[in-house]
């Protein structure tokens, strides 16, 4: 980037808001960058460690408000964590992560200090759905624990993995959470239908979960799916429990996503359910 920045507001010793001729308002981060700075002071290009742009005025206000109750050390930890996520994924992140993840980390640390362990009922589903994000989230938890001298619970890995996935895909966190909850609901239906406890570490379970993940994406995009009619009839007759359960899952998907689902999806779900319940590799 070329050109200098003009200080608009110092948020703390390490974070300030500045204006730039090309990017309008930006947030600059750097050790001591805000110390002694006043409005309209000039900061030369490369006189900072990190920069991000909050284009939305609402998000700018949220970030400023966030820094009113989050101390500088935690902001530094959050910035280091986000920088690590960006490097590990080699992918641009939605800038909202600076607000959402910082806020989450602040409350996670507060809960830990108060001795409150927040359970994550969708941990296994999150790990199965987003394995890469989950691995990075584990690294993030290790960083936070080391820098803050804490031992955050395992469930936080799942929560942070969802924040990472949200930032990578530009999808609202509420939508990402909905998919994890939907997955857990579908697994309950499967266990109830087959009167079994699913082994969530089995290869066939992972295949099923990932298949459902991509099924959800196809449904949301309304992508057509080829319908193998002969195979559908065969599965319906040979494996009625698997086939009927597949349709139960499809009806839940239709109701939750409010989108039509092609009949062909029942075929592929039936095959995955058969493999899962018969432990076929």
UniProtKB/Swiss-Prot annotation:
Modification Phosphohistidine occurs at: 104, 163, 211
Transcription regulation keyword on record: yes
Effect of residue 211 to D: Strongly reduced phosphorylation by HPr. Abolishes phosphorylation by both HPr and EII-Glc
Effect of residue 5 to S: Loss of antiterminator activity
Record region (RNA binding): 1-60
GO biological process, one term: positive regulation of DNA-templated transcription
Spans through the membrane: none
Superkingdom field: Bacteria
Keyword Transcription regulation: yes
Effect of substituting residue 245 to P: Loss of ptsG expression
Family according to the record: Belongs to the transcriptional antiterminator BglG family. GlcT subfamily.
Entry remark concerning the domains of this protein: Composed of 3 domains: an N-terminal RNA-binding domain that prevents transcriptional termination, and two PTS regulation domains, PRD 1 and PRD 2. PRD 1 is the target of negative control exerted by EII-Glc and PRD 2 is the target of HPr.
Role this protein plays: Mediates the positive regulation of the glucose PTS operon (ptsGHI) by functioning as an antiterminator factor of transcription via its interaction with the RNA-antiterminator (RAT) sequence located upstream of the ptsG gene. The RNA-binding domain of GlcT directly binds to the RNA antiterminator (RAT) sequence and prevents transcriptional termination. GlcT binding requires two identical and nearly symmetrical triple base pairings in the RAT sequence.
Protein name: PtsGHI operon antiterminator
Phylogenetic lineage: Bacteria, Bacillati, Bacillota, Bacilli, Bacillales
């Amino acid at each position: 980037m070329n050109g200098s920045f003009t200080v608009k507001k110092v948020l703390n010793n390490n974070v300030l808001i500045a204006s730039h001729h090309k990017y309008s308002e930006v947030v600059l981060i750097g050790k001591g960058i805000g110390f002694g700075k006043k409005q309209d002071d000039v900061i030369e290009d490369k006189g900072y460690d990190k920069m991000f742009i909050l284009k939305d005025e609402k998000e700018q206000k949220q970030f400023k408000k966030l820094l009113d109750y989050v101390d500088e050390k935690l902001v530094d930890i959050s910035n280091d964590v986000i920088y690590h996520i960006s490097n590990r994924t080699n992918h641009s992140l939605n800038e909202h992560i600076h607000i959402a993840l910082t806020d989450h980390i602040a409350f996670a640390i507060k809960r830990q200090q108060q001795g409150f362990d927040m359970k994550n009922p969708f941990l296994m589903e999150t790990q199965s759905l987003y394995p890469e994000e989950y691995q990075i989230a584990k690294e993030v938890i290790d960083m936070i624990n080391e820098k803050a001298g804490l031992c955050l619970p395992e469930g936080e890995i799942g929560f942070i993995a969802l924040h990472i996935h949200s930032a990578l895909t530009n999808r609202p966190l509420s939508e990402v959470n909905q998919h994890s909850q939907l997955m857990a609901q579908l697994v309950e239906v499967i266990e109830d239908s087959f009167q079994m406890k699913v082994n969530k570490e089995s290869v066939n379970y992972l295949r099923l979960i990932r298949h459902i993940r991509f099924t959800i994406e196809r449904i949301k995009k309304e992508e057509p799916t080829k319908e193998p009619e002969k195979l559908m009839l065969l599965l319906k007759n040979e494996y009625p429990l698997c086939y009927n359960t597949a349709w139960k899952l499809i009806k839940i998907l239709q109701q939750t996503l409010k989108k039509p689902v092609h009949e062909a999806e029942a075929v592929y779900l039936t095959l995955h359910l058969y493999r899962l319940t018969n432990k076929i590799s």
